Regions:
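Bacterial N-terminal signal peptides that target proteins for export
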Residues: 1-8
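Acidic, surface-exposed loops and disordered segments
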Residues: 6, 18-211
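Bacterial N-terminal signal peptides
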Residues: 8-15
Length: 211
């Protein structure tokens, strides 16, 4: 009887070992079904959108994901303004076309925000050195959360530079009411995608593990 019990325990142990996964196997299995990794790896910058603005409830979720990004000493040194008024976007675009008339010849050009119907304007605190980094982390959270809900996006620096340098466009920037010492750093265009861009190659050689 003792021998039988010993054999039973031994067989059970072998079966359990056979059913258990190695750390490598667990990692591979988790990666295959990890929605975060899937979102990161499938996200693409979108430049063609359907005309309707992103639902404000959806944008609220996107912004909440943004402000939950990691940031230096929890200063939350960012401010965000969301614009989905087509008239405002068109007026800014008209000003942009005055300075860049050749853009009007592009049949795919609809507005200066890469054709997006909803735009997030993100400003950084110029008195805090880490604020631009924090704004970048916030922007990435917004972009990824948007993609996970079927919302395309494109991160933009050009419109921010234009709005700060063009006196007429700067009036719209002032109307956004950013706090003192806050400077428009970047914009993100959001919208329902009307294209499915292909992935572009990435240079993995730029990453090296150090011994």
């Amino acid at each position: 009887m003792k021998t039988f019990k010993f054999l039973l325990v031994a067989v059970s142990a072998v079966l359990l070992m056979g059913c258990s996964k190695t750390p490598q196997q667990e990692t591979k299995a988790d990666d295959d079904k990890n929605v975060v990794i899937e979102t990161i790896m499938t996200r693409r910058s979108v430049r063609k959108y359907q005309p309707q603005a992103v639902n404000r409830d959806t944008m609220q979720t996107i912004v909440e994901c943004g402000i939950n990004a990691p940031n230096a000493i929890n200063r939350q040194a960012w401010e965000v303004r969301i614009v989905d008024n087509p008239e405002v976007i068109q007026k800014l675009t008209d000003l942009y076309l005055k300075d860049n008339p050749k853009e009007a010849e592009n049949p795919n050009f609809k507005n200066m925000f890469r054709n997006a119907p909803t735009v997030a304007f993100i400003a950084n605190d110029t008195t805090f050195a880490y604020s631009p980094v924090d704004c970048g982390l916030m922007a990435e959270n917004m972009i990824l959360s948007a993609w996970s809900m079927g919302i395309g996006s494109c991160c933009l620096g050009g419109p921010a530079r234009f709005m700060k340098s063009n006196p007429e466009a700067n009036k719209y920037l002032l109307e956004m009411g950013f706090s003192e010492n806050y400077d428009l750093l970047l914009c993100i265009g959001f919208g329902y995608p009307a294209e499915t861009p292909k992935a572009k190659p990435r240079d993995a050689a730029k990453v090296k593990f150090m011994d």
